[in-house]
Regions:
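Helix-adjacent hinge/juxtasegments
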Residues: 58-97
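A short coil-to-beta-strand element that immediately follows conserved catalytic motifs
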Residues: 94-101, 142-143
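Short, contiguous alpha-helical
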Residues: 4-19, 26-66, 105-155
């Protein structure tokens, strides 16, 4: 049950953040605050999730990494939603395999697939926090996305 809640929480928190981001116009979406912009953070989240599935699925086509940088706001938010859904589904399945990590340090190393997926879930949560800070500095009402809030909402 814990991993199902974690997977559902990931979707819920991402949805709340994307809902607010979808209301921004192009200028606000690209406005720099605290050294970055909502666009740059969303691109980073999407690129990280693309990287996750690139390695898990053994992809060879790297063109997705260039395309992400050119996506307009709505397409970027939609891609984030698609990748969040894939990650949540993968976590629900509690995978048992290993994956070789080649993009972190010079020497590849193996980790459990579940740990690999959790890294991207935690990474996304970290950047959702950065988005919250930037959006609050833009005087927007930022939704709370704490795990306990999610549990309260589903109870």
């Amino acid at each position: 049950m814990v991993f199902k809640n974690l997977a559902d929480y990931h979707l819920w928190a991402g949805w709340k953040m994307r809902e607010l981001l979808s209301t921004l116009d192009s200028d606000d979406f690209s406005e720099e605050k605290c050294g970055t912009s909502p666009r740059e953070l969303v691109q980073h989240i999407v690129l990280a999730l693309e990287t996750c599935f690139y390695f898990i699925e053994g992809e060879k086509d790297q063109s997705v990494f260039d395309r992400v940088k050119r996506y307009p706001r709505q397409e970027l938010l939609k891609r984030w939603e698609v990748l969040d859904t894939r990650l949540s589904q993968a976590i629900e399945e509690i995978p048992q395999d290993k994956v070789t990590v080649k993009h972190i340090k010079e020497e590849p190393f193996e980790v459990d697939v579940m740990d690999f997926f959790l890294q991207y879930l935690i990474h996304t949560a970290h950047h959702r926090g950065q988005l919250s800070k930037i959006l609050s500095q833009m005087d927007l009402e930022v939704p709370g996305t704490d795990y306990i809030m999610f549990l309260g909402e589903i109870s």
